[in-house]
Amino acid sequence: MKFFVDTAETAEIAELAEAGLVDGVTTNPSLIAKSGRNFLEVVKEICDLVEGPVSAEVTALEAPAMIAEGKKLALLADNVVVKLPLTFEGLKACQALTAENIQTNVTLCFSANQGLLAAKAGATYVSPFIGRLDDLGVDGMELIANLRMIFDNYAFDTQILAASIRSADHIQQCALLGADVATAPPSVLKGLVKHQLTDKGLEAFMADWQKTGQSIL
């Protein structure tokens, strides 16, 4: 499974990339707006920080404008993935951009039918939103499982990019169900390494080592 970090904060991206914890980045207009910086400049800077895919979302609502924005974003760097909403217009734009060998991430997927349409439109990634489904009392993991079955049944190349990840448990469940990618905030990705028994074991090791009075260096 690949890990993408869901943020537009370049300092956080650089830290995680240096540690080798991320394979790519996802952004959206809301995340970039919080930075107060120029949209295109932020996307370009992120693309320079990581070698993997960087999802940058269009803001237009009609297919022709989405396509134009997507082409402009794709010119920023080779690793740009154009993020499109899962609407009728978004699917038309996806098909057009895919035909020009531009990678796409069709986002805001909340049903297996939507995901199937995105795959048929040639999406590189489809992003089912787990946490937001859970908020409605719907099991988001059922969507991951259904998409995995459908994509395998018909040999779609579209990758399942699990989004709206809220916890380490979400990532574990997505991994067990066969999601190709999980994108999560920096805090969730960093939290994957934490376990109380690891901390307790390290504390005991260090206490024993201190008693020896030795130093490796």
Swiss-Prot record:
Pathway: Carbohydrate degradation; pentose phosphate pathway; D-glyceraldehyde 3-phosphate and beta-D-fructose 6-phosphate from D-ribose 5-phosphate and D-xylulose 5-phosphate (non-oxidative stage): step 2/3. GO terms for cellular component: cytoplasm. The keyword Metal-binding does not apply. It is an enzyme of class 2 (transferase). Its EC number is 2.2.1.2. GO terms for biological process: carbohydrate metabolic process; pentose-phosphate shunt. The active site is at K83 (schiff-base intermediate with substrate). It is found in: Cytoplasm. It catalyses: D-sedoheptulose 7-phosphate + D-glyceraldehyde 3-phosphate = D-erythrose 4-phosphate + beta-D-fructose 6-phosphate. One of its GO terms (molecular function) is aldehyde-lyase activity. Keywords: Cytoplasm, Pentose shunt, Schiff base, Transferase. Transaldolase is important for the balance of metabolites in the pentose-phosphate pathway. Belongs to the transaldolase family. Type 3B subfamily. This is Probable transaldolase. The gene is tal.
